[in-house]
Amino acid sequence: MVKIVDHGTWQLADADEELHTRGPGLLWNESFYFDFAAPDGSIGGYVRLGLYPNWDRAWYWACIVRPGQPAILVADNSAALPGRGSTDLRTAGLAAKQEIVQPLRSARIGLDAVAVVLPEAAAAYAGLEAAEQVRLVLDLEWVTAGGVYPYKDLPRYEIPCEVTGTVSIGDATTTIRAFGERDHSWGERDWWQISWLWSSGRLGDGTAFHGMQANIGFAIGWPSFAVPPSGELSHLTGFCAHTDFGADGFPQRSRLRLPGAPLTAIPLAFAPVAMTSPDGRVAHFPRALCEFTADDGRIGYGWTEWNQPPGWRDHGWSFLGDSSVADADLAGRGGDGK
């Protein structure tokens, strides 16, 4: 029986793997996200399906990255919604299938799409019509490893996983044996208002972890968990984060105050997308395959995302947690937040 963390606020059930009744807001969406990273950081990828029934569209993103090589990206923010009760998507450029094999235990992703080749990550924010194209085929399965983590106050859950299958780029096929995470959420999400950091990975000793911080100006109990090697998932109290950005807007590093294992995340390869709101505002979303280095020397790999709505540079991007812990962390590294 899979372990499900119980915060005492709402009860996650197998049925929550299915689609939910839409809410009233224009930006109400149902989101499914899947990622993976090879144990040596040599390849990583992610898929996200976002359904906007009140906006009459679906978003579909898929990206494969390999450090030092161009990103392979599928990004369609105006796809037609799937048929009633379905999460399968078909457009002129892609055929995507999503299957819950066993609720809260395993899921499969299939994709056959025309992707673009991005030698420079920032090109994802420009028009992609003239970019080189390549066929991208995914056949991957996510199997739960350690438990399931519902967020305390939001209809959302995260599941650390073992990931297996194949990735084909053009005529080259790579067998995947990796680790990753999948999540599912439903509700109104305004990408153009709130900035946040979300991070998930696995260290070399087998410890998996997750943490999220929204830049809302004050501290709350941020969602965070860890899974010890061959153990079960448990909630962590006290996560917070700080990020340094370059002049180009891309993150250079994030300091993650993961309780019991403080980490530094360094992006190895970016997989960004841009999003335009119904009224024309633009948000950037520079997701990245990262190398994580724990203060005790352990190294691992995974994914971090930084949502950047209009005005994002003024949102702080610094520790929103126990100030004594954050101040000690800064002092220990010369006060530079790096």
Give names to the regions the model predicted.
Residues 1-338:
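Structured soluble/peripheral alpha/beta segments that form catalytic or ligand/cofactor-binding pockets
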